[in-house]
């Protein structure tokens, strides 16, 4: 079973407008709302590719209940930890020329809710996987990540990390199965530049030395890299018209896990990750995933 953990769920508001003008009334052409949370997105993609998945997350208020019911209608198992406050609302603006991301911190989480999360995680078992994705809400300290990873290690459950917190460097000492940083996170948290293939190879080498066993590197709307410590793979394909890169990395991770954890060929898993991420980057939210097969035919995977 592939479990996902989202500690800071959200509602995403995707707004589309003409180029923004300061100190003027900027009217939107249309707006789309969708439930979000990085682990939630990973599970939605896993479910799309017919992989059993289980969402564990913190939800609150009417909107939190709405998200949980929507996920259950898709036949996805959800185990919520409840708080009284509703999920945060994140705003993504595309004005035709630029993309703007306004991300809120989320509601403060109390100790009772944290204990709910730990209780729910007792379900993980030997041979399972837990993907920990997203930011920490106020009230949860960074050591909570290590507590969760150590619990999983006791139960022989492998851990996948997709977090932007600077504590990632310390967590690598716990040797997670896979990490999924993006280029901005590597630069900001680890001082690693990945502007070209050579820098990517050097960054991958550093990440493995720090403790990562496998690395899936995403680049927003660009194409991903993968390293298992022995080789580095890269996808090449034409670029898509960007609508929103907000969920592209989550989609790429979910697609990659759907194949890689089933021991399928790395090149095929990476190609599907690339095609799925590109499809989502050309949509608001996760979109309808209608172009993935078309995009897949345009992708070549090369080993550097």
Curated annotation (Swiss-Prot):
GO terms for cellular component: cytosol. SUPFAM superfamilies: Ribokinase-like (SSF53613). Belongs to the carbohydrate kinase PfkB family. Keywords: ATP-binding, Carbohydrate metabolism, Kinase, Magnesium, Nucleotide-binding, Transferase. Pathway: Carbohydrate degradation. The gene is tagK. It comes from Klebsiella oxytoca. Its cofactor is Mg(2+). Coiled coil: none annotated. Kinase involved in a D-tagatose catabolic pathway. Catalyzes the phosphorylation of D-tagatose-1-phosphate (Tag-1P) to D-tagatose-1,6-bisphosphate. It is an enzyme of class 2 (transferase). PANTHER family: 1-PHOSPHOFRUCTOKINASE, 1-PHOSPHOFRUCTOKINASE-RELATED. It catalyses: alpha-D-tagatopyranose 1-phosphate + ATP = D-tagatofuranose 1,6-bisphosphate + ADP + H(+). One of its GO terms (molecular function) is 1-phosphofructokinase activity. This is D-tagatose-1-phosphate kinase. Transmembrane segments: none annotated. It comes from the Bacteria. The keyword Ion transport does not apply. Its EC number is 2.7.1.234. The active site is at residue 250.
